[in-house]
């Protein structure tokens, strides 16, 4: 028997074993999330570990992202060296004088006509190259690693770290929500949804981990922990002192997200309904005002530092460098945010963001990139679940109504920002909102479970767990699509080998 056939039997064997474990009669659907035993703790830890490994290990496969052929993907490493040298620009020694001489160096047609040599996807201002991606990862990982080891941290390793911390944040947040609000939630549904929603949120970073996804993974990592701290402060902590302490850390991680990827940081608006819940039964006093000011102080401190950083580079505290990009479009004349707003065009782009459809491919792995709800139909669950009177009643009882409404609105706001500022909407931009919709889906699923009889709850847990597992499989197929210089883009022969393994050596060739 060939190795290809053995590998195929093994993979399909694992597939059916997992389906067997998720069968309707499985004990995973009868044990609740509150169960306390050594076996459940080990199972949870094993699931978390396997999820992290599933997402982190494949990041090293593509030479464009693992450091073998860095091209322009090593900007974080270069900026770290620039900081150590005492300046904010990336010190390239090959700046083309023709680029400086152009009246508008940001016009791609003008650059092509003048045959200009330049560094792709950098910000260029006053004769210097800058990195316009969020600077916070430099201070969190790249600089400490460089100072401690004397070596540069390869960019994709930072993405691996942020991704692992994000996944740990998802499992922690979902567990806390389950213990607080969803006493009837089964252990199996908690584990499968935590795994699936972690993978859905970061699958693109697994495929193309360096630079762009370093900033994105850092931002979603900061935000998921910000949500964890804020929700714990409002719904779990029993003392004001504990609540303010957790709110401070929520503010700190939420503020740092602005220095990673600003559109994702718009999720900080989730603080507003949480604050309303916190203040509802409290009398506002001078002491409470001081406590809230302390809790919010990281927003002010980080905001001031980011504005100073922007001003030092671009003479504008609100300019992150987007207007000075050397890329596919001239963004220097985009004007104000709302001057670019065209109702019909913007509406069309937002629709494509969420429900855009691309026909399936006739080549392995057959899937194509679609809008969020077509990529992963499981994420449409909240739009149906919210129609249940039982779900709405649970929302009111747990004071979650405003919070859930905010989670419906925030993805639209982030999508609106993405489609207005970007010259074209790319697949990686959907990472900005996947995690929020996943959180919303978990909340609605948990609330729905509370109104079911034990028998119906087991069936619901089984069906949704299997759906979550199949969504993970869809992520694997999307990872295999040759795109954006990823692993299968470089190694077509590897894609063909994977096809043969999954099809047990049968079927026609890729080409």
Model-predicted regions and their roles:
Residues 85-133, 196-207, 327-363:
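Interfacial juxtamembrane loops and adjacent helix segments
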Residues 151-183, 224-229:
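Transmembrane-helix motifs of polytopic, lipid-linked glycan transferases
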Residues 2-71, 188-191, 244, 286-298, ...:
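Start-transfer (signal-anchor) and selected internal transmembrane alpha helices
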Residues 224, 245-261, 268-269, 293, ...:
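Membrane-interface alpha helices of multi-pass inner-membrane proteins
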Residues 218-238, 249-254, 268-270, 436-440:
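Specific aromatic-rich, kink-prone transmembrane helix
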Residues 267-303, 393:
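Perimembrane helix-loop-helix junctions
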């Amino acid at each position: 028997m060939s190795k290809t056939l053995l590998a195929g039997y093994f993979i399909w064997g694992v597939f059916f074993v997992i389906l067997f474990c998720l069968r309707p009669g499985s004990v995973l659907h009868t044990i609740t999330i509150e169960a306390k035993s050594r076996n459940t703790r080990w199972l949870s830890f094993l699931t978390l570990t396997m999820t992290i490994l599933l997402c982190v290990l494949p990041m090293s496969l593509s030479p464009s992202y693992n450091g073998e052929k860095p091209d322009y993907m090593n900007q974080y490493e270069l900026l770290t060296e620039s900081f150590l040298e005492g300046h904010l620009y990336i010190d390239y020694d090959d700046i083309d004088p023709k680029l400086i001489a152009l009246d508008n160096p940001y016009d791609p047609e003008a650059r092509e006509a003048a045959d200009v040599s330049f560094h792709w996807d950098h910000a260029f201002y006053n004769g210097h190259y800058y990195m316009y991606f969020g600077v916070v990862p430099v201070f969190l990982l790249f600089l400490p690693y460089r100072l401690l080891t004397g070596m540069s941290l390869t960019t994709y390793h930072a993405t691996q770290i942020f991704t692992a911390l994000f996944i740990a944040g998802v499992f922690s947040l979902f567990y806390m929500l389950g213990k607080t609000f969803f006493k009837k939630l089964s252990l199996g549904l908690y584990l499968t949804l935590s795994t699936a929603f972690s993978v859905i949120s970061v699958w693109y970073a697994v495929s193309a981990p360096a630079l762009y996804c370093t900033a994105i993974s850092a931002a979603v990592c900061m935000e998921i922990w910000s949500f964890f701290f804020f929700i714990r402060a409002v719904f779990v902590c029993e003392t004001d002192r504990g609540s303010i302490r957790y709110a401070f850390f929520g503010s700190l991680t939420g503020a740092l997200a602005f220095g990673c990827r600003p559109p994702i940081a718009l999720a900080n608006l989730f603080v507003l309904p949480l604050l309303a819940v916190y203040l509802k039964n409290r009398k506002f006093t001078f002491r409470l005002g001081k406590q809230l000011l302390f809790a919010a102080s990281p927003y002010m401190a980080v905001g001031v530092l980011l504005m100073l950083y922007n001003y030092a580079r671009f003479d504008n505290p609100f300019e992150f460098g987007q207007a000075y990009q050397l890329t596919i479009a001239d963004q220097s004349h985009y004007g104000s945010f709302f001057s670019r707003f065209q109702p019909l065009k913007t509406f069309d782009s937002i629709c494509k963001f969420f429900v855009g459809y691309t026909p399936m491919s006739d080549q392995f792995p057959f899937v194509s990139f679609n809008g969020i709800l077509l990529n992963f139909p499981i994420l449409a669950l909240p739009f149906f679940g919210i129609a249940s009177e039982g779900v709405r009643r649970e929302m009111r009882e747990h004071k979650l109504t405003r919070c859930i409404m905010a989670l419906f609105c925030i993805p639209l706001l982030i999508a609106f920002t993405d489609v207005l500022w970007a010259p074209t909407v790319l697949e990686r931009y959907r990472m900005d909102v996947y995690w929020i919709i996943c959180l919303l889906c978990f909340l609605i699923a948990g609330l729905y479970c509370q109104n079911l009889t034990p028998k119906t709850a087991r069936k619901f847990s089984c069906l949704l767990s299997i759906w979550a597992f199949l969504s993970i499989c869809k992520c694997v197929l999307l990872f295999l699509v040759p795109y954006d210089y990823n692993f299968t883009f470089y190694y077509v022969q590897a894609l063909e080998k994977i096809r043969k393994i999954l099809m047990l050596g049968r079927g026609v060739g890729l080409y």
